[in-house]
Structures are given as structure tokens and as C-alpha cells.
Amino acid sequence: MKPTINPARRSFVFAGAAGASLTILPALIPTAFGKAPMAGSQAISVHRMKLGNFEITAMLDGYIDVPPTVLQADQELVKMLLTQGGWPAAPMRLPVNTFLVNTGDKLVLLDAGGAKLIGPGAGRLPQCLTAAGLTPDQIDEVYITHCHGDHLHGTVTPEGGRMFPNAILRISKADLDYWGSAVEEAKAPENQRGRWMPAKRAIAAYGDRIKPFNLGEELTAGIKSVDAAGHTPGHSCYMVQSGTARMLAIGDTMHVAPVQFPRPEITVAFDWDQAKARATRKSIFDTVAADGTPIAAVHLPFPGIGRLRKNGDAFVFDAAPWQLF
């Protein structure tokens, strides 16, 4: 005869078993050993890649917050483009990247970030160098794209000394003549004269270790200046080449990726010559999109390296894949 179980009795038995399990369950839950305070800031960011026989190290000095109103365009259009790109409408948090080139013979730093003088979010370059296994006194030369603070302040210590004590500082003659000029500073509105401070600090710290160059000049084997005037009078890009492999460090040819890639005609308020900056950007974008030369940009999301391709009158940026080696 097949035994039967009263449904009410079965429910009682199961409920009782479940209750017993629940009474002992807390004792079986382990303590959460992984609990830790939130870091509250981005990790020190360093990325290496090979370029022919050269080694490129991208380093994130930090960021600077700027309002979208610096973009010289209808603000509804700006807001739409920022939203489409997944960026907050305000403020725009622009990365500040630097790039170190190891040629095998020397270490050349392309721009030096802004230290804490451009805001609390920057000034991480020294920690980046440490993470890369380097020290500031190993840097042989520093090539500055232009004399704005987010590129030049990082060459000087808070005390006014040389951040890179053994380095030669290279700045285009056109930029140095302008930003190092008390006459030009005096011409500017009083509320803009602070823009001359980065060059004055660098000149005081490096003195005769500053070696000006002419736009278009080769500065060392494998690194050549490229005339990109417009954002500043002597704004220089740098073509880095090893064998057939090359990369163009474009400095501030562009600032805001989701706006200026689809609409390269849009300038920023701090362009020295708006029309020239616009023409330079379009020319450089057209060239690198046509020949496939990778770009390295100070204000692209880290590590800031990739290729452009044309899409009608717009451009699309394809970030370079991370190299594992």
C-alpha cells in the first residue's frame, strides 16, 4: 500500500524545516573581508605602446574643468553634441595627457601637464613617472607644444625650481617670443595677464636651458616640429617617427572630442587666432585621416592615442587598442 501524506501536515513539516534553516543561516554567512573605503580619485594612469623601435608612455596628469561656453558655437548645439558623446553638459572635464618618448638614446617628454596650478584635479605627472619606473632627473628634453599652463606649469616645482633638473626645455621661438614678452602681456586685458605666468615661471626656472626652435625644425632624430599655429602664435605639433611607424602629437589642435570631431569648425575662446586655429585643425585632421597617421592628443580621454577617419564633413576617432608586451 502506497503511503500518503496529509497536505496540511506536509506544509507544516516543510515550514518547520525552513524555519530551522533560517535560524542557523546567519551563522553560515562569512564576514565581508573585502570591505574598504572608496578611493575617491582615479588611479595613477600610465600606458605604454611600441612605435617602431621607440617606446611611448602615455601619462595622465589629471583633468581640468571648463564650462561649455568656451566653445564658440550655439550652446544648444554644444549641449546636443556633448549629450550624444556621453559627456555631461557642464562642466566639461578635459583630460590632461602627457607623452614620453624613449628613443633608446634619450627620454623626451612631450608637454608636462599643469601641476596643481590649473586645479586640484591635475599634477599627477610625478606619480606617473614613478609608476613608470622613472624619476624626473632622467628626462633629457621636454618639448612644449605651447605655453599655456596645462602644458607648461608642470615643468616647474611649487618652489619655482626645475621639475626636470637635467632637461633641456624646447619651446618654439614664436610662442616664447609672445608669451615671454612683457610688452605683449601689457597689451592684454588685466584679467587675462595671468596667461603669461607659465612662460615667466619656466623662463625663471630654466634660464639658458631653454632652447627655442623654429616651427618645422627637427629637434632630435625621430622627432620633428610641425607648424600648427593658431591656438597660440607658435603652437607646435610633433611628428614622432621610428622607421616607417609614426605618430603625430597634436597638442591643443583640438580640445573637446564629442564636439570638435563631428564639427571641426568649432573653436574655443582661448584660441589666439580663431580663424587660423580652425584652418589648422581641419588641415591636420584631413591629413591624418587620409594617411592613417595615429594622433596623440593632450585632451582626448586617456591614453589619448588613436586614428581619425573621415565621415562626410565630420571625423570619427578610433582609439588605439592597448598593446600587451
Positions of the model-derived regions?
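N-terminal secretory signal peptides
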Residues: 1-8, 18
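Cap/insert and terminal regions of metallo-dependent hydrolase folds
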Residues: 2-3, 243-325
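C-terminal segment of N-terminal export signals and the immediately downstream linker at the start
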Residues: 26-58
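Metallo-beta-lactamase
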Residues: 35-36, 123, 130-131, 138, ...
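Divalent metal-coordination and catalytic microenvironments
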Residues: 53, 101, 111, 139, ...
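Active-site metal-binding motif and surrounding structural segment of the metallo-beta-lactamase
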Residues: 98, 119-170
